A protein has these predicted regions:
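Short beta-strand segments
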Residues: 40-42, 64, 94-98
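N-terminal short beta-loop-beta anion/metal-coordinating cradle
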Residues: 18-59
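Divalent-metal-activated hydrolytic enzyme cores
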Residues: 1-35, 67-91, 101-128
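Gly/Ser/Thr-rich loops at beta-strand to alpha-helix junctions
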Residues: 44-46, 98-103
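Glycine/charged-rich beta-loop-alpha catalytic/anionic-binding loops adjacent to active sites
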Residues: 57-68
Length: 128
């Protein structure tokens, strides 16, 4: 529980800092999201989408998965795309890769990760 409490404490500190820097931040953020971009990227923890393109929360609609795969059979990804286009009216859709992707590496080297992840990475192998 200490690890979870640490995250909760850090969130509270972040919220306090943001509120002190911009007292209207959370009110404005809660009002609505109106991003121009849909980012489809890798779930790699080293690639924080908003941060690496210097956009604030609400400015980038994000979908992430292992190896930034877009598959016709992935209902989750297809739902994100439809919602982004039809509801949020995003103007740009980006599929973003990165250097050192362990998902792509595992797929291309046929390194088995066992379980459902092997099935998922099959989409990468299919187009390699």
């Amino acid at each position: 529980m200490d690890a979870l409490q640490n995250l909760l404490d850090r969130n509270a500190q972040w919220a306090a800092r943001v509120s002190s820097e911009n007292p209207e931040f959370f009110r404005q953020l809660a009002a609505q999201q109106a991003p121009d971009y849909l980012w489809i990227g890798c779930s790699d923890s080293r690639v924080p989408a908003n941060q690496i393109v210097d956009l604030a929360p609400g400015e980038l609609f994000v979908h992430r998965n292992v190896a930034n795969v877009v598959s016709h059979s992935d209902v989750n990804c297809q739902s994100v795309i439809q919602f982004a286009v039809d509801v949020l009216k995003v103007e740009h859709i980006m599929v973003v890769g990165h250097y050192g992707c362990s998902g792509v590496r595992s797929a291309l080297t046929c390194e088995s990760v066992n379980g459902v992840a092997d099935y998922w990475l099959g989409h990468v192998r299919d187009v390699a």
